[in-house]
């Protein structure tokens, strides 16, 4: 029995080394089919370079309507459909029209038509329009009621939160980023956009990079839904970046305009660093990038200028 084995171990310790006795006890327990679990040392993943971690062969994809053949799907050409500048009220009106079309597509369980895609592409989000969520602002009373009744409670809270973190990226900025990537030698590959909004970076992908596979992630359900309707052949997951199933060292490029703000993301792997949201996106995106890959993200100057060097140290270690 195991008790007898332990008793014998105490006796033989006097005549043999502790190592030999332990080896004998292991054999005796094995004979009795008694499993011995060796403790697994804790590993600090944050200090392990992404390129030295195991690489999975693929990332989990998302298809809104897998039953629809690719030949019947439409990809919106953003480059040839400029969104004109407008005041807050007009931007609100465009947003509401886009939401109406999105809701119709979701109710009918279908993809948007090319005509509907033009309306959807006018959506610019709620960054810079906090008045639409202010119930005490009399000059926006009608808009407040219209928006509040058009969205579900979760959609409304997500939209209101985005007024502080989400901002529209002008096409000229996106084009400049792609040109810089081309100058760095990037031609095609797996591309991640960790906060894709309605997919403007996807829509502005240069023709020279069209063989690339883009994976988008977007926490805001409305923005993600519009992106899925505009870029019907692209995998876009409507979920927080911290919950997305994405392997390390997988992507050839990471692009996008990450959310800014004095808030933090709850991600067990990164919590110890206490990163602000934009720094968190930088750090996690870098871990998803393969060695030699290209990362081109828009962030605040604080990432490189702030007194706390935590995120810069994290980047340097990679």
Identify what each model region corresponds to.
Residues 255-260, 298:
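Amphipathic alpha-helical repeat scaffolds
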Residues 245-255:
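A short acidic, Gly/Pro-enriched loop at the edge of an enzyme's catalytic core
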Residues 73-230:
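Class I S-adenosyl-L-methionine
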Residues 26, 30-72:
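Acidic, low-complexity intrinsically disordered tails
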Residues 217-221, 226, 274-318:
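Conserved Class I SAM-dependent methyltransferase catalytic core
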Residues 3-29:
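A short, charged, amphipathic alpha-helix used as a generic interaction element across diverse proteins
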Residues 233-241:
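Conserved SAM-binding strand-loop segment of SAM-dependent methyltransferases
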């Amino acid at each position: 029995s195991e008790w007898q084995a332990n008793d014998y171990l105490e006796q033989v310790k006097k005549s043999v080394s502790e190592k030999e006795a332990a080896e004998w006890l292991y054999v005796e327990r094995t004979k009795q089919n008694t499993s011995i679990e060796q403790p697994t040392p804790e590993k600090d993943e944050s200090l392990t370079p992404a390129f030295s971690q195991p690489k999975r062969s693929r990332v989990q994809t998302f298809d809104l309507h897998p039953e629809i053949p690719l030949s019947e799907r439409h990809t919106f050409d953003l480059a040839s459909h400029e969104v004109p500048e407008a005041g807050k009220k007009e931007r609100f009106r465009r947003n509401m029209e886009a939401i109406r079309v999105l809701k119709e597509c979701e109710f009918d369980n279908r993809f948007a038509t090319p005509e509907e895609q033009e309306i959807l592409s006018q959506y610019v989000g709620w960054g810079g329009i906090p008045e639409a969520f202010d119930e005490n602002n009399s000059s926006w009373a009608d808009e407040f009621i219209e928006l509040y009744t058009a969205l579900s409670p979760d959609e409304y809270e997500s939209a209101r939160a985005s007024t502080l973190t989400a901002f529209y990226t002008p096409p000229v900025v996106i084009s400049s980023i792609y040109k810089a990537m081309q100058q760095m030698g990037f031609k095609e590959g797996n591309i991640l956009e960790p906060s894709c909004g309605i997919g403007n970076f996807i829509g502005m992908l240069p023709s020279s990079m069209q063989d690339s596979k883009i994976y988008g992630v977007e926490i805001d359900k409305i923005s993600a839904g519009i992106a899925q309707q505009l870029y019907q052949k692209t995998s876009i997951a409507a979920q927080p970046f911290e919950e997305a199933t994405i392997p390390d060292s997988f992507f050839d490029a990471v692009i996008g305009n990450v959310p800014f703000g004095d808030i933090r993301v709850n991600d067990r792997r990164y919590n110890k660093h206490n990163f602000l949201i934009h720094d968190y996106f930088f750090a996690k995106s870098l871990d998803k990038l393969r060695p030699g890959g290209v990362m081109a993200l828009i962030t605040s100057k604080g990432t490189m200028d702030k007194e706390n060097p935590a995120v810069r140290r994290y980047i340097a270690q990679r």
